[in-house]
Amino acid sequence: MGSSEVSIIPGLQKEEKAAVERRRLHVLKALKKLRIEADEAPVVAVLGSGGGLRAHIACLGVLSEMKEQGLLDAVTYLAGVSGSTWAISSLYTNDGDMEALEADLKHRFTRQEWDLAKSLQKTIQAARSENYSLTDFWAYMVISKQTRELPESHLSNMKKPVEEGTLPYPIFAAIDNDLQPSWQEARAPETWFEFTPHHAGFSALGAFVSITHFGSKFKKGRLVRTHPERDLTFLRGLWGSALGNTEVIREYIFDQLRNLTLKGLWRRAVANAKSIGHLIFARLLRLQESSQGEHPPPEDEGGEPEHTWLTEMLENWTRTSLEKQEQPHEDPERKGSLSNLMDFVKKTGICASKWEWGTTHNFLYKHGGIRDKIMSSRKHLHLVDAGLAINTPFPLVLPPTREVHLILSFDFSAGDPFETIRATTDYCRRHKIPFPQVEEAELDLWSKAPASCYILKGETGPVVMHFPLFNIDACGGDIEAWSDTYDTFKLADTYTLDVVVLLLALAKKNVRENKKKILRELMNVAGLYYPKDSARSCCLA
């Protein structure tokens, strides 16, 4: 169990500092195997971008090939946004066994199965929480279906390999959605929120809470009420909650809930609560199918106007006594199940009407050590996908306290693979953070026909190697076709084993074909002489 107090300390938390120090020994051994001699281990960070299931699979391919080439052992930090967090977290739940991890991935997409009943049970359980939000629904009923996984382990379970230094230190990114206006206006660093096996919090403020107490209630820096540590399924939903078209999805949630009034349930009466649950969630899970407006919900069977159903359901369900609600069913167990289901429907409808995501207790509430009143006056935080700010977690590895020398940025975007570089350049310029400066015209030129690797260097700060997934070296002239095949909002049901294997192979090839370039930059940051290709601050490699 972690500390029950809030920590406000500039710099690295002591647990991370110790883990990184232990990791240095493993990095030095790995460099020696790669024939790179160094007195000090350089700090290398690997970043995985967002991109839904495409990013999940491609990131696994990258990690697998880096392990195969002996490169992963030379990495100090692994950081991810959205879909990449699903892959990175899997690395730790499998104790770093990439062969087993890859085999498991292929198996999941061979059988095309998903445990609806278990996901239903987890969602109903989550709906009993005072902080239930659409993130819970998204995590247990959408992301679990996309990944074919429902992990019940926790971030704190990852401590052992991290503290022993056998695996890189992982950082999972989110942003505080309530601070989006500050981000839009000034790219405020405190917008970014991070999760590690030890802590969760705002790195820009140096304000953290033990990961085991993330979600618990604090006041004035003290623990008031303990809540169980959230499982990885929920966190994956939080980290991967960026949506393509919020208005379309909001309307679809409403459309589905309108069909689930008491009237609708009684008319479609099913033999038991379990089958009712299947009926409800089979309809709710069409949320993704209509996220692009391709499959509009059907009219109600009775021909009644759909636009009044949600309001009617919420009002009637609130007013009707529990006894009357359950009158048609005499089985006590069935009564309880039905009540829980309808409570879930009601709560989901309310969250959808408010579009409420990522609700959790604010551990900085009434904290005297925080001068920013916005941070300390809120009872709740609303944490969402960091890809809504920058689709790669550069802001979490750039602080000087982490002393990163080399960044390997793997971009799994379906669109412009340099948008993350543009956004990070702007962020760093505003806050005087060392980062290679690239001219907009050059980025525009690169984006028209991306190569597989770009090396960006500035006078100070880390060297950045940027690897677009879809590039002319691997895809030839078919980049657009590849992008269409692996669309961000493509359902997992369309991912056959062949489609998965092809994407894994593409991601691996990008690492393998650029191994020499990576080794060269490792030599450079390790302090060894190696001839430079160019004196330019940014060069294509």
Curated annotation (Swiss-Prot):
This is Cytosolic phospholipase A2 gamma. Its main location: membrane. Its EC number is 3.1.1.4, 3.1.1.5, 2.3.1.-. The modification Phosphoserine is found at residue 337. The lineage of its organism: Eukaryota, Metazoa, Chordata, Craniata, Vertebrata. GO terms for cellular component: cell cortex; cytosol; endoplasmic reticulum membrane; lipid droplet; membrane; mitochondrial membrane; nuclear envelope; nucleoplasm. PANTHER family: CYTOSOLIC PHOSPHOLIPASE A2, CYTOSOLIC PHOSPHOLIPASE A2 GAMMA. It is a lipid-anchor. (Microbial infection) Interacts with HCV non-structural protein 4B/NS4B; this interaction likely initiates the recruitment of replication complexes to lipid droplets. Pfam families: PLA2_B. CDD domains: cPLA2_Grp-IVC (cd07202). Not regulated by calcium, coenzyme A or ATP. Lysophospholipase activity is inhibited by palmitoyl-CoA. Lysophospholipase and O-acyltransferase activities are inhibited by methylarachidonoylfluorophosphonate. Lysophospholipase activity is inhibited by phosphatidate or lysophosphatidate. O-acyltransferase activity is up-regulated at low concentration (10-20 uM) of phosphatidate or lysophosphatidate, but inhibited at higher concentrations.
